[in-house]
Amino acid sequence: LGGDGTLIQASRDLISLELPMMGINMGHLGYLTQVSGEEFMDPVLDALLNDSFTLEKRMMLEGSVVGAQKTVKGIALNEIVLTRQDVLQMLHFQVYLNDTFFNEYMADGIIAATPTGSTAYNLSAGGPIVAPGAQLMLLTPICSHSISARSIVLSPEDRISIRLVKWSGGKSYSAVFDGDQVFPLHYGEKLEICRAPKYTTLIQLKNVSFLENIRQKMNRI
């Protein structure tokens, strides 16, 4: 019971149990939820009892902040974001794909998103919308100081490594998982991102297509 944020948090908290989940929207948008709390619930309960539903696996991301002394890990259903904490200066960082240098950015940060997360922060930053059942990763710079910096679509087998290039004392940077789990990132450390070994499984009750869901819910914003 709740909004998209509640469902995202539950997906991380319950990942080891691999339980199917269904969201009942009590929040604002409810893009990930199946029904609204205002709807009559008897048909929903009947569908669950009669196995009149499908299960949809949603890819997740695993991120690691790798330092000289320790490594901390987290998982995300929507996205992992490299961002600043308390300054307005741009970040200067490099991105490596599968240990090969890809690009260097001056930007407010960068988003690594799943197909589920393609309609969240990634969309606001100009990234593409992707069907939620797809198996891929999106990498979208945030307000890059370049006319050529664009989102890229990656294989789910790719490994992303993000490294800070320039550091000035007093700056604080963070790796943020799904908007609420925050790990500080310091110069000399790197943020490594790959597909998580487990999935979130969502119960799908209604025969509503992905595009219809986009049309109905995104037009409200």
Per-range role (PLM):
Residues Q9, L14-I24:
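Gly/Ser-rich helix-loop-strand patches that form or flank binding pockets
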Residues A68, L82, V87, N98-F101, ...:
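ATP/nucleoside-binding phosphotransfer catalytic cores, i.e., glycine-rich phosphate-binding loops
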Residues G3, N25, I80, G179:
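A residue-level signal for conserved active-site and pocket-lining positions in enzyme catalytic cores
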Residues H28-D108:
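Catalytic core of DAGKc-family lipid kinases
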Residues V95, G117, A175:
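Short aromatic-centered micro-motifs
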Residues G3-T6, L29, T116-S118:
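Short glycine-rich anion-binding loops that position phosphate/pyrophosphate groups of nucleotides
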Residues N103-A107, I111-S148:
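Gly/Ser/Thr-rich active-site loops/lids in small-molecule metabolic enzymes
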